[in-house]
């Protein structure tokens, strides 16, 4: 009497691994390939963990039910013996006809019904186990795919030692480095600026990740020349970006590094740090003429209104008149934070954009962009100009500003 229930109990235990399947449903159609995040992997792992817990709980419940049923069958077998001790034929799935003995017919009928129901449930569980197995295999393949994508993206989030290729990544894909790092200490950080990339062998201009000291990583446009690597901090070329922005925008940066943009005062300050730097200014007019200027500079922090520290010859051309221990100082000014040297006016409101205005009349490379030279002089003064080259009222066609540490002269 115990052998048949025990065999069925074994079948149920084998099939019980599919518990809670009815709540799972069919797998969702595979998503289109895309970059993954750790959150997606965590969601899948959490779902599989919950599924495993549910299966275990269902197995325990089914095991208890089978144990109770087995005990009832054993009790029935003892009660159904004839007075001489001969047992009633064993109750099986194929022998469900009630005995003609004195056993209680209601009890036997109830047990027969339960056995039929259990057999039906076992068949359903076998089917669901097979279905869930296919579902779990698909989930496993998806997790492997996501893990592969995460491994591919790891250079964007880990240090230089995990994948040095992250230092040469251009959108949307990193390029491989030209050679090994110079020393082991460089294996754990990104380059400080474009000049460090140049010193390590990079000769192609483009977009790269850098990380100045004390700053999180960010993307910059590097221009590689025979003089070394230059970090582009501003570009004007087609008027696609509005440069009449508030203080916070000029602090953090705006625009597209591949087109018109302003890198951000705080980023420039971090790149320069305490080192000596030089600023290159490239200008172009509407007749195809070009001018290039270079001069030593230092940029203070936000507590100095990101003041440019300039030497006397250059300072006079830009209108700087504030003496500091480091030289003549020219604070940055916007329409919502006025730091210019005109006490009676706000140069950023009178003109346009944010700039180291001085007395409003020397230069403004972040002014309004005109696609042709306006006729009205009052309108022209709001444009992009550099007084000592094409004059106060000539709006320029294109400008680029670049910085490089002065130590690059010795390195190059």
From Swiss-Prot:
Superkingdom in the source lineage: Eukaryota
Residue runs in coiled coils: 106-153
Residues with attached carbohydrate: 183
Keyword terms: Angiogenesis, Coiled coil, Disulfide bond, Extracellular matrix, Glycoprotein, Lipid metabolism, Secreted, Signal
Subcellular localization(s) per the UniProt record: Secreted; Secreted, Extracellular space, Extracellular matrix
InterPro entries: FIB_ANG-like, Fibrinogen-like_C, Fibrinogen_a/b/g_C_1, Fibrinogen_a/b/g_C_dom, Fibrinogen_CS
Protein name: Angiopoietin-related protein 4
Gene of this entry: ANGPTL4
């Amino acid at each position: 009497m115990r052998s048949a229930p025990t065999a069925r109990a074994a079948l149920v235990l084998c099939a019980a691994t599919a518990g809670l399947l009815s709540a799972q449903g069919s797998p969702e159609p595979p998503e289109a390939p895309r970059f993954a995040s750790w959150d997606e992997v965590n969601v899948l792992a959490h779902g599989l963990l919950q599924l495993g817990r549910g299966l275990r709980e269902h197995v325990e419940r089914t095991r208890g039910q089978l144990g109770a049923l087995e005990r009832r069958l054993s009790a029935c077998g003892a009660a159904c013996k004839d007075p001489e001790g001969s047992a009633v034929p064993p109750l099986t799935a194929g022998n469900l006809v009630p005995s003609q003995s004195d056993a209680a017919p209601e009890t036997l009928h109830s047990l027969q019904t339960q056995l039929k129901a259990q057999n039906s449930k076992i068949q359903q569980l076998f089917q669901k186990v097979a279905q869930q197995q296919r579902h779990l295999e698909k989930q496993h393949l998806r997790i492997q795919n996501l893990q592969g994508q995460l491994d591919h993206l790891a250079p964007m989030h880990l240090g230089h030692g995990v994948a040095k290729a992250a230092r040469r990544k251009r959108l949307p894909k990193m390029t491989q480095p030209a050679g090994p790092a110079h020393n082991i200490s460089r294996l754990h950080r990104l380059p400080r600026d474009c000049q460090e990339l140049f010193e390590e062998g990079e000769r192609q201009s483009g977009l790269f990740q850098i990380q100045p000291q004390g700053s999180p990583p960010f993307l910059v446009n590097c221009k590689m020349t025979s003089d070394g690597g230059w970090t582009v901090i501003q570009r004007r070329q087609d008027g696609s970006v509005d440069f009449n922005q508030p203080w916070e925008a000029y602090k953090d940066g705006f625009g597209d590094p591949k087109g018109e943009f302003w890198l951000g005062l705080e980023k420039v300050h971090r790149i320069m740090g305490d080192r000596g730097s030089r600023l290159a200014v490239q200008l172009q007019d509407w007749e195809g003429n070009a001018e290039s200027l270079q001069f030593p500079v230092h940029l203070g922090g936000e507590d100095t209104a990101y003041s440019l520290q300039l030497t006397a010859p250059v300072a006079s051309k830009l209108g700087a008149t504030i003496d500091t221990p480091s030289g003549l100082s020219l604070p940055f000014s916007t329409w919502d934070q006025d730091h210019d040297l005109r006490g009676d006016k706000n140069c950023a409101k009178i003109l346009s954009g944010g700039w180291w205005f001085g007395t409003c009349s020397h230069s403004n490379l972040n002014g309004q962009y005109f696609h042709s030279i306006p006729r009205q002089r009052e309108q022209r003064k709001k444009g992009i100009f550099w007084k000592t080259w094409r004059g106060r009222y000539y709006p320029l066609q294109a400008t680029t500003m670049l910085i490089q540490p002065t130590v690059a002269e010795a390195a190059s």
